[in-house]
Amino acid sequence: MMFVHIADNHLGYRQYNLDDREKDIYDSFKLCIKKILEIKPDVVLHSGDLFNDLRPPVKALRIAMQAFKKLHENNIKVYIVAGNHEMPRRLGEESPLALLKDYVKILDGKDVINVNGEEIFICGTYYHKKSKREEMLDKLKNFESEAKNYKKKILMLHQGINPYIPLDYELEHFDLPKFSYYALGHIHKRILERFNDGILAYSGSTEIIYRNEYEDYKKEGKGFYLVDFSGNDLDISDIEKIDIECREFVEVNIKDKKSFNEAVNKIERCKNKPVVFGKIKREFKPWFDTLKDKILINKAIIVDDEFIDMPDNVDIESLNIKELLVDYANRQGIDGDLVLSLYKALLNNENWKELLDEYYNTKFRG
């Protein structure tokens, strides 16, 4: 069996509120679909966050429906699990994934497929918040039990798992039962390693969603995994990275004429207008402004002499607010996990009062 593992397309996302960046997201996704149609795998496994929002723009819905309809018409079976970005927040709400039900199987449970006379067990479930950890662990135990008689078995999840994401995780790596392949989503960088006698894989996002993903993109690329599961056991050598090109990001540190010329050369080497970030010494801002027609957007900060050589310790765009909240709470003698849970509840319009009541009853009433 040949299958594709893909995740985290975030259709509808508008980085810097730019039409061009929204289009980049769509173009990257469409290029992935084009490559999948050329490859003609038996199955596509999508590990969540197809959409960036519970209510994506009409264009995002149209592009997704057209893409999965094409896969369906070419007899390519698609399984998908819901990510945190497309999960309903209240009773009565539906995920936008429901609109794709004629073309994909939205997985919250198990399925067994037969490819060339061989049975493959596939199971998975939607994103679970950390507060639903016990429910998630019960599901994993059930999956493990149901899969025990199958040699080839795949688990699909959209979760943060420690240590692959050190703070904002919902599961520990030792929570995962033994499977042949772990088709994971949620973390935007590519991760591929042997684990539990199988292969653990985060396919990563298909575009640069946050600026701090650019360095990983240069090292590991963006796209999806193509997995050859025709042998009895899976090895990392059976997995191929299928890469696509993303818009380039250029870091600058302009403090003199030499560094300005270096920045110009970097920008002119780009295939399309890049996103620029970094630092520009104030006196060189007029120089840099002459390049505005060659860049998509300038996110570099203007600094005075005394700050030009200071290290960039804080990247506002990628700043981990959650980490700061937990660190501050712990230093104040407050339960950091509680603060983080409250932050998430407020962010997602969830019932924070119920969360506090549950915490109080558990902590003080046993």
Curated annotation (Swiss-Prot):
Q: Name one GO biological process term.
A: DNA repair
Describe the task this protein carries out: Part of the Rad50/Mre11 complex, which is involved in the early steps of DNA double-strand break (DSB) repair. The complex may facilitate opening of the processed DNA ends to aid in the recruitment of HerA and NurA. Mre11 binds to DSB ends and has both double-stranded 3'-5' exonuclease activity and single-stranded endonuclease activity.
Q: What family does the database annotate?
A: Belongs to the MRE11/RAD32 family.
| InterPro entries per record | Calcineurin-like_PHP_ApaH (IPR004843), DNA_Repair-Maintenance_Comp (IPR050535), Metallo-depent_PP-like (IPR029052), Mre11_archaea-type (IPR032885), Mre11_C_arc (IPR055244), Mre11_N (IPR041796)
The record's remark on the cofactor is:
Binds 2 manganese ions per subunit.
Pfam families (alphabetical): Metallophos, Mre11_C
Organism, by scientific name, is Methanocaldococcus jannaschii (strain ATCC 43067 / DSM 2661 / JAL-1 / JCM 10045 / NBRC 100440) (Methanococcus jannaschii)
Recall the GO molecular function terms of this protein's record. 3'-5' exonuclease activity; DNA binding; DNA end binding; DNA exonuclease activity; endonuclease activity; identical protein binding; manganese ion binding; Y-form DNA binding
Q: What is this protein called?
A: DNA double-strand break repair protein Mre11
Query: Which key words are in the record?
Result: DNA damage, DNA repair, Endonuclease, Exonuclease, Hydrolase, Manganese, Metal-binding, Nuclease
Source species taxonomy: Archaea, Methanobacteriati, Methanobacteriota, Methanomada group, Methanococci
The Enzyme Commission number assigned here is 3.1.-.-
Q: Where is the active site?
A: H85
List cofactor names only. Mn(2+)
Q: Any idea which positions bind Mn(2+) 2?
A: D49, N84, H158, H186
Self-association and partners: Homodimer. Forms a heterotetramer composed of two Mre11 subunits and two Rad50 subunits.
Please tell me which top-level EC class this enzyme sits in: hydrolase
Q: Which residues are recorded as binding Mn(2+) 1? A: D8, H10, D49, H188
Describe regulators of its activity.
Answer: Nuclease activity is regulated by Rad50.
